[in-house]
Amino acid sequence: STEYIRGINEGRVSSMESVCSEHSPCEHGNIECECIFCWEHDAQCKSRRRELDLGEPTGSERGMANNYEQSRNEDLYCTETVPSSAALQANTITERDIREDFTDQTVDNIYPQLHSGSRASEQLEFAFPTIGTRSWEILIRQSYEHLKPDYKEEDFQSHIRRVRRQLFPEKTMDNNGSQASTTQMLRDDIERCGIESIADSASEDNGDGVDGTCISTVDIQGNCIVNAHGNEQATGSKTRKIRATTTPESSESKKHKGSNNQQNIQEQSSTTAIADGHDIVDGELDGRSESNRETAYYTFVLHKNNCKEDWRYIATTRAKQAPSFITFDHGDHIHILFSSSNTGGNSTRVRTRITKFLSATSAGNAEATITFSKVKFLRNYILYCIRYGIETVNIYGNKIQQQLTEAMDTFKVLFENRDPNDVILDAGCKLYHEEKKEYQQKRCGQRKQQNLTDIILDKIKEKKITTAQQWENIIEPEFKIQLMKEFGLNVDSYVQRIVRIERTRIQQIIKSKTLTEIMVEILNEEYIKNFTPGEDNSKLQNIIQWIEYMFKENNINIIHFLAWNEIIKPKRYKKINGMVLEGITNAGKSLILDNLLAMVKPEEIPRERDNSGFHLDQLPGAGSVLFEEPMITPVNVGTWKLLLEGKTIKTDVKNKDKEPIERTPTWITTATPITNNVHMNETSQILQRIKLYIFKKSIQHREDKYTINAQIQNKLISRPPGLVEPIHMAIVFVKNFKEIYKLIEEEDNAHTVNEKAIRLSEEAKQEAEEWQTALQWNTMEEEQKENEKQTEDQDKESEKETATQ
């Protein structure tokens, strides 16, 4: 499939191979050239010489032959010549012809220099026919028939893509998706790809040239003609975004491109208004590069009188790392710009860090929440800040983010090219909004409700508010007044509804967790606040020891008690749905349950609710319930049996229809037996549905004749060494985790297990075991320190006694 041209050039033999079986060599004198002047489509490349290499005469020089009229039927390597008038009688070859035309086609016969090889006698899998045969004649005349291109559409498209890759490799393509490039870069790329002639003059109709002063988008046509279009046509086009490579060369190319772009922009006429946007490609100044597609810009407004005067000094004394943000000073207020995740999940936390860094007051926090919004178009936002006047611009943060650096670069470019007529220094700032025109008239209604909901919800989550009264007690008056100024008197109705929704959401999450998972969460959040490695943690250990001591004094196995709490919470057994703590006054019943169930958040129902006709109206939808001193009578004993068994019952709700109460884990604290007022038969049925623990000793309170009577005179235990908190009960629970679940497995054999009970996941089990190991090590270290301290004290006392003797 290879043709050879033989020519004589000044007495020297020169030959040249054609890279294609049907076209002439390249006019550039390069036999391997693939430029667009030689090859118009990819189909011709199929005929290109690739694998087969028969060599060339020794001493030959590559070049163009002088004699083009020489017969093409002469072959440099063949001693025979095919007559030009010969005609093929048939296009088919029989089996007999093949045997005759391909005789003795072995490695040894075709390549004598390999006659001594080990495989020289093997038949060739592919060989040329014997010279002069019909097969040889057909091969010479019709060798390219099966390689003719079909000129299909995909061949043209493939060639166009190949030329695109050569002209504009990925490292020089813009990252903003519009395929923008400077014409100077076009010239460099065209010269690199071997295109010798491209018109350097600008056309009169579009005004685009190659003088390096205009940024434009580029389209590559099928005939490989480069057309430059203005930004008016490119803006908003949805072209494919080409990702830039991360090689050092690409980084240098990006820097070079950015410097060229900035230089080109500065060369524009100073009378052109930046706001028109005809000379800036969208995305270049919007900060939409590949590096920050996953991030977004956010902004809010903060008046200076809503910040403390000495906030700069306070910021220098903070131990935490300063957040990264930019401030645009507009006199009495500042506009703050920062970057966060595009989904907005982390933006609220970053905003809170910034307001704390600026020492914002309660009114300032409310203002930041109200004016908080997402910046979709960075260039428009900066033009907005410039239009209403700029006093100073500052960037803060120990580590300046790349997105903020890009924003500052954009600000510098826009500020230097600003139109003085657009700057209104004495104008008051309007609230910055980015929205479609059809939504502008609806803003007052929809956005106001959305902003108020977001503000209240953020505050509820921050302060962990679960009731409307907690909102009144915890939230600062300045914050509530600021909300009333913005949204009026309907704030209270929003608060009540949002609090109810948030409480229901939390209850649904707690319902799906075991007590072990809740205890581990407490450790993850609170343990580091109460335990400091290398320091004196004896107070923490003393409270834990006191809890174990209290159970021991009441003759209650603490592991058994904790195991049954883990059974009741996930509804593990059928027909057992309640736990009762019975004991004398001040025995520590409520102390234990309040700290053990602090994160379970049960609905608390006191005794006075028994006189109400709606005493169970809090239970529909509740995750758990805690009764204090309930009164079980023959009238309501049936309801209590169903409740303690875990059956679904219906209850009356004020101004509503009856609502069902699903199975709800129940805890009860009482000073007298709960079955005192019911029949003996009812008593046994109730006791089958509960787990009962009796506390016999009271915690020492105060030495007073009115509080200490004969009943508890000899049944006192010491007061705790400190305030008992949920973290202490969590440590006691997790420290005995394996023993608790070992006991639960034993109890499973004696009870009917509920198939719908909540199960402990393997991940939570592994985390609890890790915590148990860590707590045991800490306990051992503290005990060792305590023993060493006691030994030292004993030695000192013995030394004193020896000295006195």
Swiss-Prot record:
Keyword Flavoprotein: no
Active site: 381
Biological process according to GO: DNA replication; viral DNA genome replication
Top EC class for this record: hydrolase
Localisation per UniProt entry: Host nucleus
Positions that bind ATP: 583-590
Domain observations: In the N-terminus, the endonuclease region is involved in binding to the origin of replication. In the middle, there are the ATPase and helicase activities. The C-terminus probably contains a transactivation domain.
Record-given protein name: Initiator protein NS1
